[in-house]
Amino acid sequence: MASNPGSDAALGTQNPLLSGSPRTKKFPLTEQEVFYMNCRAAYLTIFKSSLENIISKDQLYLALQHAGRNPSQKTINKYWTPQTAKLNFDDFCIILSKEKPTSKAELLKSFKKLDVNDDGAILHSDLQKYLTKRGEKMTQEEVNAVINLADINANGKFDYVKFCKLYMTTSEQCLKTTLERLEADSKLRRQQFGSHMEGSPERGPSPAPKPSPRVIRKNDQETFSSKGDTSHALLSTTRKFKTSVSFTMTMSANSNQDSTLTEPNLKDWQCAQSKGCFFLEEDGEVVSHQYKMHIAQRSVLYLTIKPLYLSQVEGKRCPWLSVDTALYILKKNENPAEPQLMCFTELRNREVFGWTGELEAGIYWLIPSTTGCRLKKETKPVTEEAQLVHRDETGELSLTSEFRSTLSEIFEVIDLDGNGLISLEEYNFFELRTSGEKCDEDAWAVCRENFDTKKNELTRQGFMDLHLMEANDREGDPLDLWVTLHSMGYNKALELTEACPFVINIYAERCKPRIKVVHMEACSGQLEKAICKSVLDRSDAKVMDGYENIIVHTCNYDTWITSIIENKSDNKVIIHINNELSKNCVNNRGLNIFAVEVAPRSTMVCQHVMPLNEQEEWIYCCVYSLVA
């Protein structure tokens, strides 16, 4: 979880009741401050202190409700897995930043799809069928509770316009009540603002959430200025650091564009190629295809990975082309759980990242990676939704040209071997991504019978017709089509903003290399170990003064900078990270200030940093402090 809780995905811009105080009239709260205050207000409705933990699903559900959310069971299960023992306030802020409050317009739009007469009402029979058969199915008892609401039901119909108004009013009142409770409790007020006294004429504090994996927040004891200026930071005396180390690196403009990758003479070399894709999940995690590579004999190899160019409509944005890519090559050893890192594609020539070297015969794992500095959740709202289907004069349904163009792009992405056809194996990766299910042999046989195929593989036209059939099955309702598009990384304008397709090329001098897609899963676990190993092999290491077991490693790859924290002690430690003095930089956390918890005898990736604008000089300046 690395998204900014102060982003547009926050609780909204409702001004807290504290804005009536003299201090806040003079110094209006920023959007991030409003978000943080709303988070605290909701949390402190359930707990006495934000240092307490959420220890059950029920507590999480209640806290989200008090924050103006209406979480489904699916949403709760996403954040409270079988492995979850507790969630802290930091986790709660991150969840709220990702779970946007439902707007009235969104509610109305959803209900309108069931409003066959376009009169603002839905028959109880239709509503009951929809609520018990679709999505997260409701019980009959739950449906009856909705139908029996006196103010919004009459004559066998459900008035969804009144319901939406009631829903929004209730949600706003819930949040307002929590804020009033926070305002009324001066003790909680002092806890929120640390040592900063109410009514101070100098400036308003900006409590800044600092989320990250394995974080224990201590925001109750520390606040920061809204501009992130350390000279104005309001640090309470309860926040103490035992020791600190700092790193400063100045990178010249275009330094990361210089060609450090030299392509060998590939005239007589043999090549294998495969495509793949990074997909950004709702929680900020990245999922991608992963591969096995077989080398028949010892040979010099040239491996590259780069974003995949798709045939685009003129004028359409291609944000994924600027996403950084890398490929880590691992080999199994005596301990299958600990494969050996052989190399990774750290050299660059424009958008291509590559590696040249010799490898022995054998089977290798190829794990793609992206830092997360460029591939981020889209925050800019889409003003106009693209049309996916339309009916002609005869009433026959067809796909719009814009949607057909997008489906053609998706076809290129899922055609992993690049032969212009979709095999059952390739189609299953697509199905797993969009529906979570596989297509068995019998279903594939039916698919081949009904849609255009060649050599038992689906053609581009067959892929189009498959989605047209889906639209017809839903009588033109594009809901399922949008689920597919969102799963593949497209927004409502049919722009690919939350995925990055890529292509891998493997050249071998002495044999024919082979590559096979074996998984599509989260880029974590083995990848994090590989990244840590690559940094440890060549980093600038600094030991925390007086704490020789705590080491910060920073590695400059020209294109990006990676830092990891090594904890050799027998106790967990909390490290506070401050990037505020960095210039023209963006990191994968999305925040300048955050804290991480490092488990005993472990090493973890702290952050990746890249230039915001590659045409300008960028300065990496970071202070790592051990929290007392």
Swiss-Prot record:
Keywords: Calcium, Cell membrane, Cell projection, Membrane, Metal-binding, Phosphoprotein, Repeat
UniProt keyword DNA repair present: no
Residue list for modification Phosphoserine: 200, 212
Gene Ontology molecular function: any one: calcium ion binding
Subcellular location field: Cell projection, Cilium membrane
CDD domains noted in UniProt: EFh (cd00051)
Gene3D superfamilies given in the database record: EF-hand
Residues that, per the record, bind Ca(2+): 415, 417, 419, 426
Domain EF-hand: 102-137, 138-173, 402-437
Compositional bias ranges of the Polar residues kind: 1-22, 222-231
Record bears the keyword Repeat: yes
SUPFAM superfamilies: EF-hand
GO terms classed as biological process: positive regulation of protein import into nucleus; positive regulation of protein localization to ciliary membrane; positive regulation of transcription by RNA polymerase II; protein localization to motile cilium; regulation of smoothened signaling pathway
Location of region: Disordered: 1-24, 192-231
Pfam family, one: EF-hand_7
Positions in coiled-coil regions: none
Cited InterPro entries: EF-hand-dom_pair, EF_Hand_1_Ca_BS, EF_hand_dom, Miro-EF-hand_domain
Recorded topology in the membrane: Peripheral membrane protein
GO cellular component: ciliary membrane; cytoplasmic side of plasma membrane; plasma membrane protein complex
PANTHER family, alphabetized: EF-HAND CALCIUM-BINDING DOMAIN-CONTAINING PROTEIN 7
General function of this protein: Component of the EvC complex that positively regulates ciliary Hedgehog (Hh) signaling. Required for the localization of the EVC2:EVC subcomplex at the base of primary cilia.
Assembly and binders: Component of the EvC complex composed of EFCAB7, IQCE, EVC2 and EVC; built from two subcomplexes, EVC2:EVC and EFCAB7:IQCE. Interacts (via EF-hand 1 and 2) with IQCE (via N-terminus); this interaction anchors the EVC-EVC2 complex in a signaling microdomain at the base of cilia and stimulates the Hedgehog (Hh) pathway. Interacts with EVC2 (via N-terminal end). Interacts with EVC.
Protein name as it appears in the record: EF-hand calcium-binding domain-containing protein 7
